[in-house]
C-alpha cells in the first residue's frame, strides 16, 4: 500500500486577483516557495512532494501521521497569506490513492469556495506496513543529442513531449509521473515490474524517438525508495548492467521497526 496526500491551496484563484491582480513574478515566487516548503517539511519525515500545478501538490507520505500533517498545515497558515487543505489516502497503486484523496477534498466543496478552509481528512487509513516503489527515469544522452545541439526552448519542448507520453503510459498501469528537473522524472509505480517499463520505453521510443532508462527503488518510505532508485539509475549510467531498467529493494532487516521521531519539530 502507498499513502498519498493531496495538498490544495484554499480559494487561491480569487485571492490572486483580489482586490486587484497581483504581480505575476510575486505569485510565481510564492508558489515555488510553497512547493519548496512542502518538500522540506514532508521530507523531514521521509516523504516526497511533487508540484503538479503548484496550487495542487501531491506528496507520498508513507509513515507520516495525522498530527504531523496538522503541524505542516498550521505552519503554512502562520507563514503564508493563504491556507491549504489536505486529504490523505492509501491504496495498492499511486493513481488510486491520489484519486481517493482528491475525492475526499472535493466532498468539502470547491477549490474556490471562500468558506472551505483547512480541510484535513483521511479517506481510509494510514499505512503502517506498506511500501513505496519509485522509478527515477531519465533520457539517454540528452546533453549530446539535444542540449548541445538544439535551442534551449526546443530541448525543453522535447522533454515536455516525453513527459506527457510517459505520464499517459504510466497511467495505464495506475502509476504516476512527475517532472523533477533537467531530463528527470520520478514515477510512483507500485505494482509495476521491469518488463512493464521496458515495454513502455519501447512504445515511447517508437512514438517520440526518445530513449529512456530507469532505476527502480522499493522501500518503506518515499525517501528510502527514491534513494534506491537514484542508485539504480547510476548503475545503468556507469554501464554496470546491460538493461535499461534496474531495481533495488530495501532489505527486510532494514525495514524492521526502529525508533523514528515522526513528531520532531518542523
Curated annotation (Swiss-Prot):
GO terms for biological process: biosynthetic process. GO terms for molecular function: GTP binding; GTP cyclohydrolase IIa activity. The keyword Nucleotide-binding applies. Pfam families: GCH_III. Catalyzes the formation of 2-amino-5-formylamino-6-ribofuranosylamino-4(3H)-pyrimidinone ribonucleotide monophosphate and inorganic phosphate from GTP. Also has an independent pyrophosphate phosphohydrolase activity. Belongs to the archaeal-type GTP cyclohydrolase family. This is GTP cyclohydrolase III. The gene is gch3.
